[in-house]
């Protein structure tokens, strides 16, 4: 009986230790090592998203990334958005990316603008948490931090090269990465019907 109690207490201690070890401080999140923008370039389709506060693309989200000769990455993206609570339109956005620290090229700063006056413009951190370049990419942005360093208002997109989805083995990788950025269970599927 004493052995069973010992095993039970040891397993509880281990679980508590693990949960305390996992931090949601944004600065602790790992990003894609040796990120290569040229391999990342091309068309991506959003399959799932965690929205920030405010207006955000709703569905049929896609992005086409291009790397210029000087290494600058740009993107043109599309997606449907609901305006004024009832008007659903396809919106076009454009973005330019800069790398503040060349030692971590997966941590970029994105300056974006809506290509119509009623769409927002601004800038966000844009981190590529993980990608295999051929199938999936997980991006992350935190707009504001809490006092403890965790994200107060952020968003994330799960991209695929194929608008139809990801194979089960890659879905497992994506779920693990969602946990690592403290967003497990917060994603909504993104409809890809070809509307935009």
From Swiss-Prot:
It is found in: Secreted, Extracellular space, Extracellular matrix, Interphotoreceptor matrix. Residues 1-21 form the signal peptide. Keywords: Disulfide bond, Extracellular matrix, Retinol-binding, Secreted, Signal, Transport, Vitamin A. Its main location: secreted. GO terms for cellular component: extracellular space; interphotoreceptor matrix. SUPFAM superfamilies: Lipocalins. Pfam families: Lipocalin. Disulfide bonds join 24-182, 90-196, 142-151. Belongs to the calycin superfamily. Lipocalin family. May be involved in the transport of retinol between the photoreceptors and the pigmented epithelium. This is Purpurin. It comes from Gallus gallus.
């Amino acid at each position: 009986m004493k052995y069973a109690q010992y095993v039970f207490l040891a397993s509880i201690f281990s679980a508590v230790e693990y949960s305390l070890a996992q931090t949601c401080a944004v600065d602790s999140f790992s990003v894609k090592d040796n990120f290569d923008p040229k391999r990342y370039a091309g068309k991506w389709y959003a399959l799932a998203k965690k929205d920030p506060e405010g207006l955000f693309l709703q569905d049929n989200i896609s992005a086409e990334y291009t790397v210029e000769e000087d290494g600058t990455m740009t993107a043109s993206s599309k997606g449907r958005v609901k305006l004024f609570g009832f008007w659903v339109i396809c919106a076009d956005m454009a973005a330019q990316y800069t790398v503040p620290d060349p030692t971590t090229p997966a941590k970029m700063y994105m300056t974006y603008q809506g290509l119509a006056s009623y769409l927002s413009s601004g800038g966000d951190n844009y981190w590529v948490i993980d990608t295999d370049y051929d199938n999936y990419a997980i991006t992350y942005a935190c707009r504001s931090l809490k006092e403890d360093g965790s994200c107060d208002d952020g968003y994330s997109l799960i991209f695929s090269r194929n608008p139809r989805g990801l194979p089960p083995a890659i879905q497992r990788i994506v779920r693990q990465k969602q946990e690592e950025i403290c967003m497990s269970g917060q994603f909504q599927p993104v409809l890809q019907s070809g509307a935009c």
